[in-house]
């Protein structure tokens, strides 16, 4: 997977996208065939996958957390399954938010582990069975829609309404992970995030295919005494511009900004530069929760940077307060039907 999306992916298709179109065509054939023909294993609990059409962030992790909170409110014990992207561990691991570090397990699993049981595994089936062993009765996959090795009881695809699907081309000419027709066929529902219009064509396609469309917004938790502050905003996420818009919406005056690749592990020099620039201009440092978990327990002056940074926490808030419950209930019904079919086949 591409770690840093080139800017032309998110612009109107130009010469770069067309030059790479033969490779995109080949990539699309392979990705589409893999989605259609992949053998998928069953587990005895409902599986919800939170995915997106494109490379990069669209709000999958906060969506997964919102679904988990709704499950807990229903008396369920949800668990998260993540690949652990950005981490070095290649064995199935139960994540401990207090002891593990982002360099080992990835940043998103640490955010998830604050909410519920979280397992990272490059082998999804093995990871799912580990969650079942931990007593989980609802598995929520953060990403993995295009490469699922598990039978999914609900595939919720998240799309950012400002970025949409970028130039609409498949990797490497654009950000799209697999042919849209196949992705649309396999998704259960669509979640549009924000108030932009870049996702409107896909929303219409989903509605035409009788797929439910949910609406949500990322709501930041407003820090105390933040409005009007002069800040240095820094972020190592898929879409730093989205974070900067959030900071401005909260009333922060961004004097300086520093963008880094998604899942970026800060070097000592980068940390020193951020601290120096903030002090020189008398600015409040501000960053994302994902960046904060990468700094926690990191080397050198990372702890100093974290201590001096205002961390903006976010929540995914559905327009319909029953939306998350609807996703969960549908997954439970689909799981029951799946298990009944499996039992019927095994008894014949």
From Swiss-Prot:
Binding-site positions, ATP: 54-61
Any Gene Ontology biological process: lipid A biosynthetic process
Q: One Pfam family for this entry, by name? A: LpxK
* SUPFAM superfamilies linked to this entry: P-loop containing nucleoside triphosphate hydrolases (SSF52540)
Q: Which InterPro entries match?
A: LpxK (IPR003758), P-loop_NTPase (IPR027417)
Q: Name one GO cellular component term.
A: plasma membrane
Which Enzyme Commission number(s) are listed? Answer: 2.7.1.130
Q: Name one GO molecular function term.
A: ATP binding
Disulfide pairs here are none
Concerning its family, UniProt says: Belongs to the LpxK family.
Q: What role is this protein assigned?
A: Transfers the gamma-phosphate of ATP to the 4'-position of a tetraacyldisaccharide 1-phosphate intermediate (termed DS-1-P) to form tetraacyldisaccharide 1,4'-bis-phosphate (lipid IVA).
What protein name is recorded for this chain? Tetraacyldisaccharide 4'-kinase
Organism in which the protein naturally occurs: Agrobacterium fabrum (strain C58 / ATCC 33970) (Agrobacterium tumefaciens (strain C58))
């Amino acid at each position: 997977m591409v770690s840093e999306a080139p800017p032309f992916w998110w612009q109107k298709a130009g010469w770069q996208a067309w030059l790479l179109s033969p490779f995109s065509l080949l990539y699309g054939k392979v990705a589409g065939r893999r989605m259609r023909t992949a053998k998928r294993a069953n587990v005895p609990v409902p599986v919800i996958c939170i995915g997106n059409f494109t490379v990069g962030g669209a709000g999958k992790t906060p969506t997964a957390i919102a679904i988990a909170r709704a499950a807990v409110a229903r008396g369920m014990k949800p668990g998260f399954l993540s690949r652990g992207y950005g981490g070095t561990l290649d064995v199935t691991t139960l994540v401990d938010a207090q002891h593990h570090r982002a360099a080992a397990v990835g940043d998103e699993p640490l955010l998830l582990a604050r909410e519920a049981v979280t397992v990272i595994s490059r082998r999804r089936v093995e990871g799912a069975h580990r969650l079942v062993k931990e007593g989980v009765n609802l598995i929520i996959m953060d990403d993995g829609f295009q490469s699922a090795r598990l039978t999914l009881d609900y595939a919720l695809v998240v799309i950012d309404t400002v970025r949409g699907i970028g130039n609409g081309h498949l990797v490497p000419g654009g950000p799209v992970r697999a042919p849209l027709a196949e992705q649309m066929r396999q998704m259960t529902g669509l979640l549009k995030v924000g108030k932009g219009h870049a996702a409107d064509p896909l929303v219409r396609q989903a509605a035409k295919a009788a797929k439910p469309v949910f609406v949500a917004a990322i709501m930041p938790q407003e820090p105390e005494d933040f409005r009007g502050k002069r800040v240095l905003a820094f972020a190592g996420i898929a879409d730093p511009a989205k974070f900067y818009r959030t900071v401005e919406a909260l009333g922060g005056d961004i004097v300086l900004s520093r963008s880094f690749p998604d899942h970026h592990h800060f070097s000592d020099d980068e940390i020193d530069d951020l601290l120096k620039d903030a002090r020189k201009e008398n600015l409040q440092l501000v960053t994302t929760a994902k960046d904060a978990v990468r700094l926690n327990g990191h080397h050198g002056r990372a702890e100093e940077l974290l201590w001096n940074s205002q961390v903006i926490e976010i929540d995914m808030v559905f327009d319909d307060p029953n939306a998350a419950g609807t996703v969960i209930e549908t997954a439970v019904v689909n799981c029951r039907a799946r298990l009944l079919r499996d039992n019927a086949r095994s008894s014949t």
